[in-house]
């Protein structure tokens, strides 16, 4: 009768270090080894029982025995028979378990097959699973020692010694003996492609260097790496300590990752849910002209921007008297102001809308366009270039998540813009009343927001190429740092300094142009008097825009017919009240 093959401690270390078993295969292997170890114990116990029974028969044949000794021997024999029956029941249960695993396809038991070669085991295993495997293996041997101690009264010492004679680091891979005389072996199938993939993706080997913490030994190829791994990083105290350190590092990183995830979730919930308390506008500043001024708190507010000269040839003085600092309190009084860079200088809405279409559909962020531009875009996207009022509503809700949550507030503004803007024409046809766009009228109303000197208009239009990248950079910087506008405490910020320099340069350009215009200034006029020729056009506000971005537009020589073409969604009568 052949005995099961036992792995030496060195072979066990090689299996653990090569990381060649998957967790499922390890679990099946451990279950198989426990069953095989129990079968080995049963077989040796049977031998011992046969020897003891033969000795008892020989002892009973001797005539000089005392009756008391015979009774003790009979009791011992009875106990041994009872224990033998229990072991037989356990063996039957183990055989049933093995049959169940074989039916499930986890085990492939074939008679007469040789033992499983170590080279055929190939799948990855993490260090935590290695430690768990080691604990389970050593724990199984410890349990065997406890069984030996508990049954010492049954004269099973020989059985215990034979079952635990091997070191605790040994594993049983195969059992050639069973109750029916058939041999059983555990076979694990593996494809060669998986082995190659594992070879190239070994977590401890990359770019010809050993990735063991603190090692970084250069290995020419993967076999040399395995040789180095088995020799230098064997299962000893040093490697165990390094594994514990790595486990602590991973735990710290997981803790930090969970904290960062919570922080990110809080930031996202804060940005997507409106707060009940007043706050400064988080959206960045948008520069749309070469002459850019900040929005004042109200017409009655005396506050204005501080202007310090950036060049000695064009000194600037404050425009009005009073405090020369715009604080966040004044911004709270103003409320959020929407940026409208795409409508001021005929920047096409289609380009920005095409780039950010998915963003607008999923994020509750108000699009940076006027209602008139959005209505025009929806009509132009339709196949027939005409939409009914209900179809316009559907286009708004389909393209923008912002308009899906408060439909009753913005529909009134859409109707108001359709009625009052000349570029929208109502046509009666078979479908009913549909709306179309008069493109000439729409393009004609755009430049009316800046009138006066043609040179100033040309200067503003040509400066758009400069303002666009500058605006994008300032928006990114302001959004990243969540900067307020001009406050005394925030003037030391580098992003605000760059913003202030850009504003000063723009103002200097306006001053040079204004002072050089002979029709608007006299020789005795001071630079401060020349500045009064530049007016700030205040765009009306939407009270529902608590997070709208800021737009700053300067106009010169206010046109009398300007009010006719302003954005009517901002009228107080049709405010988007929430």
UniProtKB/Swiss-Prot annotation:
Region (Disordered): 293-325, 511-578
Compositionally biased spans, kind Polar residues: 293-305
Record field: transmembrane: none
Transcription regulation found in the keyword field: yes
Record-level GO cellular component terms: nucleus
Principal place of residence: nucleus
GO biological processes: negative regulation of DNA-templated transcription; negative regulation of transcription by RNA polymerase II; regulation of transcription by RNA polymerase II
Stretches for region Ctbp1-binding: 284-288
Compositionally biased spans, kind Low complexity: 306-320, 515-527
SUPFAM superfamilies, per the entry: Winged helix' DNA-binding domain
Assembly and binders: Dimerization is required for DNA-binding. Isoform a, but not isoform b, interacts with ctbp1.
PANTHER family per record: FORKHEAD BOX P, ISOFORM C (PTHR45796), FORKHEAD BOX PROTEIN P1 (PTHR45796:SF3)
Protein name: Forkhead box protein P1
Biological source species: Xenopus laevis (African clawed frog)
């Amino acid at each position: 009768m052949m005995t099961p093959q036992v792995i030496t401690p060195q072979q066990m270390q090689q299996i653990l270090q090569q990381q060649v078993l998957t967790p499922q295969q390890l679990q099946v292997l451990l279950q198989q080894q426990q069953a095989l170890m129990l079968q080995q114990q049963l077989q040796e116990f049977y031998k011992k029982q046969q020897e003891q029974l033969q000795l008892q028969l020989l002892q009973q044949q001797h005539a000089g025995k005392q009756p008391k000794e015979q009774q003790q021997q009979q009791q011992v024999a009875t106990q041994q028979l009872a224990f033998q029956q229990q072991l037989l029941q356990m063996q039957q249960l183990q055989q049933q378990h093995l049959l169940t695993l074989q039916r499930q396809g986890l085990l492939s038991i074939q008679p007469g097959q040789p033992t499983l070669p170590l080279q055929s085991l190939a799948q990855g295993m993490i260090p935590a699973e290695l430690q768990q495997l080691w604990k389970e293996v050593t724990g199984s041997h410890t349990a065997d020692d406890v069984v030996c101690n508990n049954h010492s009264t049954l004269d099973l010492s020989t059985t215990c010694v034979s079952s635990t004679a091997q070191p605790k680091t040994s594993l049983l891979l195969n059992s050639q003996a069973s109750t029916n005389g058939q041999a059983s072996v555990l076979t694990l199938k593996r494809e060669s492609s998986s082995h190659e993939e594992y070879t190239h993706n070994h977590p401890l080997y990359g770019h010809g260097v050993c990735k063991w913490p603190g090692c970084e030994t250069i290995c020419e190829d993967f076999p040399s790496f395995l040789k180095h791994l088995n020799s230098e990083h064997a299962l000893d105290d040093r490697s165990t300590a390094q594994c514990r350190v790595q486990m602590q590092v991973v735990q710290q990183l997981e803790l930090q990752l969970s904290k960062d995830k919570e922080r990110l979730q809080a930031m996202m919930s804060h940005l997507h849910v409106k707060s009940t308390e007043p706050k400064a506008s988080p959206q960045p500043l948008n520069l749309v002209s070469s002459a850019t001024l900040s929005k004042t708190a109200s017409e009655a507010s005396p506050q204005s921007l501080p202007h310090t000269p950036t060049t000695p040839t064009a000194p600037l003085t404050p425009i009005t008297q009073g405090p020369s600092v715009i604080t966040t309190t004044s911004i709270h009084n103003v409320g959020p102001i929407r940026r409208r860079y795409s409508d001021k200088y005929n920047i096409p809405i289609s380009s920005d809308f095409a780039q950010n279409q998915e963003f607008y559909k999923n994020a509750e962020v108000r699009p940076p366009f006027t209602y008139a531009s959005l209505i025009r875009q929806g009509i132009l996207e339709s196949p027939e270039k005409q939409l009914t009022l209900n179809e316009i509503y559907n286009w708004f809700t389909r393209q923008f998540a912002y308009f899906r949550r408060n439909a009753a507030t913005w529909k009134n503004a859409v109707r108001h813009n359709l009625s009052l803007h000349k570029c929208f024409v109502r046509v009666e046809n078979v479908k009913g009343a549909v709306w179309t766009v008069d493109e000439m009228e729409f393009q004609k109303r755009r430049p009316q927001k800046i009138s006066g000197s043609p040179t100033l208009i040309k200067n503003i239009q040509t400066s758009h190429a400069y303002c666009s990248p500058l605006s994008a950079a300032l928006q990114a910087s302001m959004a990243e740092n969540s900067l307020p506008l001009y406050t005394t405490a925030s003037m030391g910020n580098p992003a605000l300094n760059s913003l202030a320099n850009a504003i000063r340069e723009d103002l200097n350009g306006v001053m040079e142009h204004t002072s050089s215009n002979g029709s608007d200034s006299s020789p005795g006029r001071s630079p401060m008097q020349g500045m009064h020729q530049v007016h700030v056009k205040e765009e009306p506000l939407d009270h529902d825009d608590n997070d709208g971005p800021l737009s700053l537009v300067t106009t010169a020589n206010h046109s009398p017919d300007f009010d006719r073409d302003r954005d009517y969604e901002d009228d107080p009568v049709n405010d988007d009240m929430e």
